[in-house]
Amino acid sequence: MGNSQSINKINFETVQNIINNNITFGKFMIINTLENSNQECLIKNTLSPEEEINTLNNYLKNDKNVNILIYGENCCDTKVIDKYNQLYKLGFSNIYIYIGGLFEWLLLQDIYGDDEFPTTTKIIDILKYKGKSNKFIK
């Protein structure tokens, strides 16, 4: 079976608690795996790509125990796993993935409102973040 790390997955309620600082185990750094050209709508408190680099470099030197939340475009976005592994190899250990991603968050925002599911901007076309359909399934 060998050595393999277990990926820490969290749901939308935990993300809400992180945003509202209702987590008992400290503050979180929130990052995403969306393309640089697709950063106009993010979950509240997400660092910009520039802030992410600077903040990660600072924590890399000073505190690898920082809590890091990663999310992607949707539940099929494998870039979150790549980012998780990259950070793990750098020595970070408190890494969590919000599997639902921005798509789930926006769907919940559409139903329950901006106060419960805040983003940096309002998006009308939620399906922009649904991902590509699987061509193998008919």
PLM regions and their residue ranges:
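Rhodanese-like catalytic fold shared by cysteine-dependent sulfurtransferases
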Residues: 2-16, 20, 24-28, 33-69, ...
